[in-house]
Amino acid sequence: PTMAANSNEKTVAFTALTEDGTGTFTVDVANLNIKKPGMYYYTVTETPRNTAGVDYAAKSMIMVITAGYADDGEDSSLSYWAALHDSTNYNDKNSKFENTYTAGSLKVTKKVTGSLGDKDKKFNVDVTFTAPAGKTVKSTITYVNNGAESIAPDAWKLNTTTNQYEAKVTVELAHKGSVQFNNIPKDVTYIVEEQDYSREEYTATYEGDKSGTIANDVKSTTITNNKGDDNIDTGVILDNAPYILMLAVVA
């Protein structure tokens, strides 16, 4: 890139990646204290942030500032030209700091079994996400449950016991229902826990990954609620046949 021809603002724009796409940063040449003609070399590195799911560029770049007189010295003001080189490939002048964001998904499915299981009943399921230690979540997790829902970055709260950020949501699921959480940053951990329905004589079992760590894939768990197999008062099975009640009347 070349420096803007504005003597009052000596800045050079370079390409850089952010979690939102492509961005730029500026270098104020005036702050480099270049007073004489010549070529000046600077090492430019990126300082990693603490955004969950992001791998930051580890390489450095070489910034070359050339200071000289554009009019063979007749004008006493120095002009500046800038170039940014990849430190591993000096001929590459189009390099950038490239950060990689990786996310995964979590799918929770509900099944209801047993002769007394209510397949229309909605069960409350708590899902708790925990950010990696020292990290914050800046992306929005989306899911659909009774309409489009999301977990925004400001929904994450610091757990003062673990010193990690957490976000917790409750979803409703009936038989054969499911919910999938998308755009969960990698290395975020999760726990799926259905609320207690033992007083209603439901027994919950989990299949798959009830808890785990998000990666670049889809984690899944199925919660099965069973009721009734051991509570049937066995006897004559009526099915849908008429039930005839006989009364003996004693005169």
Where are the predicted features?
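Solvent-exposed loop/turn and edge beta-strand elements of beta-rich ligand-binding domains
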Residues: 1-251
